[in-house]
Structure formats: C-alpha cells, structure tokens
A protein has these predicted regions:
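A cross-family signal for N-terminal binding/gating loops and helix N-caps
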Residues: 1-187
Length: 187
C-alpha cells in the first residue's frame, strides 16, 4: 500500500450534492461535530501456515479461530490439541482424517469439510502455539495482493492503533490502514 494518510478521499456534500476530491489526511475537516468513529483495534496475526499433505503435496492452512478461544487439551509427552476452524488450500485435496504437517511440532488433522474451503480441524502441537505461528506463520494478505508476504508487511498491514493484547485477526481492517498517529492525535 501507499503511504498512510496519503490515499484519496471522495466526499459527498449532502446539501449540495457536490463531490469533493480530497485526501484522507483531511478527513477531520469533513466530519460533523460529535461524530463517533469506531476503531477495530485487533492485531493481525501470522495465521497462515504452509505445510504438506501425507503424500508430500503442498498445503496451506489459515487458522480462523482466534487463539484465545482455543480450548487446549494435553495429549501427553508435551503435546497439546485443540479443535479449530480454518481454511485449507487446495480444499479439494484435503480429506477427512488427513494429517497436514507443518514441521515436527505442528500437525493439523482434518475433521470435517465445510463450504468455500472452510474445515473443522484438530491442531496438535508441542510448545507454545502462539510462538509457533509468530515464528513460522505468514501474514494473511488481502486476496487482491498477488505476492508472498514479507517481514515489512507485519507492520504495514497493522493499524496504528492495533493492540498486542487484541491479537487474533486474520485480516487487516483495511479501512483503518489509512489512519496515521498524527491524525489520531488530532481526533
């Protein structure tokens, strides 16, 4: 994306019907006094993992269940498990009972197939599940961006008001990406 706050802003004057071409950095000039803005302060997590099917084919898994909602159960020998929802690509290659492998310390067992690539799965892991995703996961970029994520994207695709204690989003609240710290301070 471009520089925060530099995007264009189209404003419609309701009284005159006139369209005004401006920039997002001038947003406050167009908001009526007393306007309430609601901000999604969740932090996007690197919830996309690249792994393999038992046959060796490449598979992609996007965790949809927020990590704080995972009900963890011990399996012994340091392993944990939890049921979750996620997207698997390619969905047609995921079969119920498959164990997708994402390293020696993370497996995803396919429990049920849903629509549009959504699956019910059981995660099996050792160690800290958040640390696994933070270290090896990929940031889920918007689908119109046709490239792999980079380290820089972890900052670019966060709002300036995203909070670490609100980590769990698997998609950036894109409307919020235009806000700058300066604009927030003026509010």
């Amino acid at each position: 994306p471009g520089e925060r706050g530099a995007s264009r802003l189209l404003v419609l004057d309701r009284e005159t019907g006139k369209r005004i071409h401006s920039h997002f950095s001038h947003l406050l000039e167009y908001l009526p006094k007393g306007t309430l803005l609601i901000a999604n302060n969740s932090r996007v997590v690197p919830a996309r993992m690249i792994g393999q099917r038992p046959s060796g084919g490449k598979m992609e898994f996007l965790l949809l269940t927020p990590m704080p909602l995972l009900e963890q159960h011990g399996e012994g020998d340091g392993w944990h498990c939890a049921e979750a929802d996620g997207l698997i690509k390619p969905a047609k290659n995921a079969r119920i009972g498959d164990h997708l492998v994402f390293g020696d310390d993370l497996r995803v067992e396919v429990l049920a197939k849903g629509e549009f690539g959504r699956h019910r799965v059981r995660l099996h892991w050792t160690g800290d599940i958040r640390a696994l995703f933070e270290s090896r996961g990929h940031l889920p970029l918007p689908p119109y961006i046709k490239r792999e994520d980079t380290k820089d994207d972890r900052g670019t695709y966060q709002t300036v008001y995203a909070r670490d204690d609100k980590a769990g989003s698997v998609a950036a609240p894109t409307a919020g990406l235009h806000f700058t710290p300066e604009l927030r301070a003026q509010m």
